[in-house]
Amino acid sequence: MIEQLNEILNSFKTKLKSVKDLNDWEELKKEFIGKDSNLTTILKSIKTISNEQKQEIGKLANQIRTTIIDNLNNKQEELKNKELLIKLEKEKIDVSLKNSSLKFGSKHVLNIVIEEISDIFTEIGFEMVSGTEIESDLYNFQKLNLPLDHPARDMQDTFYLDNNLVLRTHCTNMTSRMLTKLASLKTDDNNLAVISYGNVYRRDDDDATHSHQFMQIDGFVVGNKISFANLKWILKYMCQRLFNKDINIRLRPSYFPFTEPSVEVDVSCFKCDSKGCFICKKTGWIEILGAGMINEHVLKLNGLDPTKCSGLAFGIGIERIAMLKFNISNIRNFYENNVKFLEQFKFYSE
């Protein structure tokens, strides 16, 4: 039986050399380790031989079977790689060929709006930053006058992560970071104007006007004797530049934890000249953003002295502006990668 086992191994090695493809490989596998193979028959018959031979023959038979399986696996990998190379060679593409039907992409409509707003503010001296989308509770809430037990935290359903981290609920997190950085400089020159932009996240149910992820631009100015009149001028200047019309703005009292006083900013309807339409809901006004004077507590929490400086702040929803500018009714259109929808804005990106 030992001679028979050695003959099986030698025969396998000889036939393995002649295997050219996976079909040959399958036949070889069936012949040497299949259920009807000689090796399998020997392994089944070991229980019938004497105890003296059982250990020696059983050990040798299993070693040969392991050797055959290892060689089959290596050969299979070799054949698969060979077939892949042949397939790749057949499918090789000549990248030097010209394609007359090549289509060029364009800027996404949200990037168009971001660049337009950024240009408006950088032209009047604002610095532009982006910041991090994963933020600490400290900068996202606590340094913005939203301590752990503040009821206003319920205004924003938050995605909480581990280790007191959150997905930022607003770009105002960069306001607290930049104010803290300004305070660390310990200088008498507390003048700073910054806009920050990027994705923000809230646990909203997605529908035509809401999304769990959307984009914002936040801005703030701090310095000596910054007043509400400065805020009103900035807001009107931005709205007139953004909508390319001599529109009016209306400020309504509101509440934001990090500003006092706080206002909701409406613009006179640029679609119907304030006569009343479906865009402005027959009111002649369109709600567009929130703003206010930076709360004194926020200045203190970030290391600044409210007796020596003051500030203003505002927050703009990018999707909101894009929907108004381009008559888009469903916020989900921005994120569905529908080429027909996106191609409409190619003209604006050229």
UniProtKB/Swiss-Prot annotation:
InterPro entries: aa-tRNA-synth_II, aa-tRNA-synth_II/BPL/LPL, Phe-tRNA-synth_IIc_asu, Phe-tRNA_ligase_II_N, Phe_tRNA_ligase_alpha1_bac, Phenylalanyl-tRNA_Synthase, tRNA-bd_arm. Tetramer of two alpha and two beta subunits. Its EC number is 6.1.1.20. Its main location: cytoplasm. PROSITE patterns: AA_TRNA_LIGASE_II. The lineage of its organism: Bacteria, Bacillati, Mycoplasmatota, Mollicutes, Mycoplasmataceae. It is an enzyme of class 6 (ligase). One of its GO terms (molecular function) is magnesium ion binding. One of its GO terms (cellular component) is cytoplasm. Binds 2 magnesium ions per tetramer. It catalyses: tRNA(Phe) + L-phenylalanine + ATP = L-phenylalanyl-tRNA(Phe) + AMP + diphosphate + H(+). This is Phenylalanine--tRNA ligase alpha subunit. Mg(2+) binds at residue 260. The keyword 4Fe-4S does not apply.
